[in-house]
Amino acid sequence: MGELPPQVQNLVAQLQQLQQQLQAVITQRAQVEALLRDTEQALEELQKVDDETPVYKAVGNILVKEKKEDVIKELTEKKETYEIRIKTLQRQEEKLRERFAETQQKLQNLLSPQAG
């Protein structure tokens, strides 16, 4: 068996690159989804607390007393940002999967005549 033709080598390299990009996007999405879950959980807990209960927010290594409504507003904004980021990452993931499938098909088409 000889060396693979340059076109095949190029497609294999493209597939590897797409696979790495896809894995990076999947990892990012999982991280942002975890942040979203944490934020939603914090918002749920804040809803249970009455307005007179002191609320503290972590700032670096210290806790700072904050107004409950300010913390809720900040967490709600973070939640919305995370949701937008997740949608963006999902679209990127979808496009990468499509490109991966197309490139894989091109590679199979190139290799199938050689298989016979």
UniProtKB/Swiss-Prot annotation:
GO CC, one annotated term: cytoplasm
Domain of life: Archaea
Keywords: Chaperone, Cytoplasm
UniProt-recorded Gene Ontology molecular function terms: protein folding chaperone; unfolded protein binding
Compartment(s): Cytoplasm
Function of the protein: Molecular chaperone capable of stabilizing a range of proteins. Seems to fulfill an ATP-independent, HSP70-like function in archaeal de novo protein folding.
HAMAP family per record: PfdB
Name this polypeptide is given: Prefoldin subunit beta
Species in which this protein is naturally found: Archaeoglobus fulgidus (strain ATCC 49558 / DSM 4304 / JCM 9628 / NBRC 100126 / VC-16)
